[in-house]
Amino acid sequence: MDDASTLIDVKEYSDTEVQKNRVLTLEEWREKWVDGKIGFHQEQGHQLLKKHLDTFLKGENVLRVFFPLCGKAVEMKWFADRGHCVVGVEISELGIREFFTEQNLSYSEEPIMEIPGAKVFKSSSGNISLYCCNLFDLPRVNIGKFDRIWDRGALVAVNPGDRKCYTDIMLSLTRKGFRYLLAVLSYDPTKHPGPPFYVPDAEIKNLFGSTCNIHCLEKVDVFEERHKSWGIDYIVEKLYLLTEK
């Protein structure tokens, strides 16, 4: 695993047993949206994505970009405005509707026949499709393959016991020559139960190392006042670029 040169020294906790049995239900995630407890949403978009956008897109046009656990990420419109095709999956219908409303995009909705109770929301322009369903049900629907995956707030939100299954689904969606941008968080997992969950380097290597080249692009101190209520005194975001071996 290559590492970016950085002045930030992050302690790695090899023993993540403390979080391994932590489980959040889909209903709990829906409730977070209803209650407005969405501190993970970034109204201005993700700054590290902006900084490394050229590395991610590599100058290519008309790419298919996948957003796992997309919420109402403003970056979806960034990519659509650049002519790319965006597909996301999100359990909260409220989050999806807020995305289209806040981005002033008209849309349609239709049921997903393969998944009872699920829906897909499509922009009138046709290049944004957001699936409202459990991500782990997604393999039942043929959503095609993707050139790019932007994984921010997804791997860190998946229950730790589901990470292998999650990773298998993500990699099954990739096209040849894919580029997968992954943002994870480092903090002391003995002080905060998650989510977002702590994902150490060793876990990334274990999940992706057999099929992907793993390169750490940057590490950034993202500690804010709100993090004090988590009981932690530091939190570092790491951005990885995963490419096909």
From Swiss-Prot:
Keywords: Acetylation, Cytoplasm, Methyltransferase, Phosphoprotein, S-adenosyl-L-methionine, Transferase. It is found in: Cytoplasm. GO terms for biological process: methylation. GO terms for molecular function: thiopurine S-methyltransferase activity. It is an enzyme of class 2 (transferase). It catalyses: S-adenosyl-L-methionine + a thiopurine = S-adenosyl-L-homocysteine + a thiopurine S-methylether. InterPro entries: SAM-dependent_MTases_sf, Thiopurine_S-MeTrfase, TPMT. The keyword Acetylation applies. Substrate binds at F40. It comes from the Eukaryota. S-adenosyl-L-methionine binds at residues 29-40, 69, 90, 152. The modification Phosphoserine is found at S14. One of its GO terms (cellular component) is cytoplasm. The keyword Nucleotide-binding does not apply. Its EC number is 2.1.1.67. Pfam families: TPMT (PF05724). The modification N6-acetyllysine is found at K58. Monomer. Belongs to the class I-like SAM-binding methyltransferase superfamily. TPMT family. PANTHER family: THIOPURINE S-METHYLTRANSFERASE. This is Thiopurine S-methyltransferase. It comes from Panthera tigris (Tiger). The gene is TPMT.
